[in-house]
UniProtKB/Swiss-Prot annotation:
Protein name per the record: Heptaprenylglyceryl phosphate synthase
Reactions catalysed: sn-glycerol 1-phosphate + all-trans-heptaprenyl diphosphate = 3-heptaprenyl-sn-glycero-1-phosphate + diphosphate
Record's keyword annotation contains Lipid biosynthesis: yes
Lineage: Bacteria, Bacillati, Bacillota, Bacilli, Bacillales
Record-linked Gene3D superfamilies: FMN-linked oxidoreductases
Residues the record lists as binding sn-glycerol 1-phosphate: K12, Y159, L160, E161, Y162, S163, G164, G189, G209, N210
Keywords linked to the UniProt accession: Lipid biosynthesis, Lipid metabolism, Magnesium, Metal-binding, Phospholipid biosynthesis, Phospholipid metabolism, Transferase
An example Gene Ontology biological process: glycerophospholipid biosynthetic process
GO molecular function terms attached to this record: heptaprenylglyceryl phosphate synthase activity; magnesium ion binding
Amino acid sequence: MYDIRQWRHVFKLDPNKGISDEQLERICESGTDAVIVGGTDDVTLENVLELLARIRRFSVPCVLEISNLESVTPGFDFYFVPMVLNSREKKWIIDLHHEAVKQFGDIMNWDEIFMEGYCILHKNCKAAMLTDANTELQEDDVVAYARIAEHMYRLPIFYLEYSGSYGNPELVQRVKQVLKQTQLFYGGGIETEKQAKEMAQYADTIVVGNVIYEDIKKALATVKAVKQ
């Protein structure tokens, strides 16, 4: 399924974490709509290429979520580019993107590139610390970022990132209510069928990541929970 607007469930794999061939096959053949390759630390060209080659044995759409320029490589179906809207550092909002386009603009296929307006809400996660994200936000702040993503920046994706911590379903619902065109992704702390189903009521697309490495059976069960 190569229309990202139809995606309801995606798995996110960290190239810096090990996964067996058997587990990877179960993930790729699970019925998930796509597999995103991405992480916060120690993402290298070498480990991205290795994981890409293994995923490419299967037909599932494969996305690289770009965390640094050094690990970008051809071969993915799509490239997701985070813009951390609640970062205190300008480089996570525009500077890194400017550098990427400066270096590679002539060869970039813009049809494969999707900008993500990130709002990171778990203050102790690696992504928040790396990007110096202001996570002390009221609900109205988050809703405002969502509106900025859709109406000011015209971003195709708004990503609520709780990164390892299960978020507030009521907030996800509020955000969804104000988005008409921008696709709402939710990621963070989904470990059970119940949690997957709950967040899928409101988010257009849920992202399941950490539980893959903790309990593969629980991870796989989230696909059915969302697709039913």
